Amino acid sequence: MKKQFLVRKNSSNSRYLRRDCVICLQKDGLRAQLSPCGHDQFDYSCICRWMDQSLTCPICKRHVDCVFYGFHGSSLYKKWYTQSLGSNQYSISRQLLRQPSFSSSENTDRLADLLRVRRFIYQKAWKSYENPSLSSHRQYQIPTPIQLASSASLLKKVESFIAKELLLFEYLDGHQINFIQIFLMGLLRVQNIQHPQTIDELAEFIGHEESSILLHELQRYLQFRPLSISSYLYSKRYLYGPEGLTMVQLLSQIENIQHESGPETENS
């Protein structure tokens, strides 16, 4: 990679993230930049764990040849090549995160688990329902378009949820994800989440069933408003499928299926 690619803007010399990492949605991480696509909205530990699952950019889906990190000024940085890690890509994060300067992130692990189980839920076309044993616990009202548009904190929660859910649709590239996110955020400022037309308009991009699930899950998410990725994944409020399983129980089931029959079974 040419040096000017890495230093095309003065701000790109920063060792730390300038914007929220698109994987964990936090801004306090160490920046990593991918080659050849150039995307750099990733925390280093996040992208290492992402590549345990796929050697492609989370934004544009292009194959990743090299990762740059540890930036110091305009010309000092570290890098590693994906091909140097051998054929077992599932060892990537274990190899790379041994470095003491990049400690493991529990939040990143939780996000990887969350994406895995969320993809399984969409494949099964399951919608969450409330755990009856927790029905007496506090619930928030689903915000109206006016309430949503006037609350920066609510907008942030909705934006974060939509961003994570759209990552599940592997046929969407980064530009498409960004466009759909902006489109849906604008739509929800003027139209109720539950409105049939909201589903119909989103369905033009990801399909009717998927749109129905996404908006239903967003609605449930806003009713309980978990504080973090971990609290969402570990919540006992959300149950799925005929057995009424939590996301953690589903994750355990997925891992057992893959251990016994191989990863292809997850898609059945």
From Swiss-Prot:
GO cellular component: mitochondrial outer membrane; nucleus
Gene3D superfamilies: Zinc/RING finger domain, C3HC4 (zinc finger)
GO biological process, one term: proteasome-mediated ubiquitin-dependent protein catabolic process
Taxonomy of the source species: Eukaryota, Fungi, Dikarya, Ascomycota, Taphrinomycotina
Subcellular locations according to the entry: Mitochondrion; Nucleus
Coiled-coil segments: none
InterPro entries on file: Znf_RING, Znf_RING/FYVE/PHD
Keyword annotations of the record: Metal-binding, Mitochondrion, Nucleus, Zinc, Zinc-finger
The protein's name: Uncharacterized RING finger protein C16G5.03
SMART domains on file: RING
Protein source organism: Schizosaccharomyces pombe (strain 972 / ATCC 24843)
Chief location category: mitochondrion
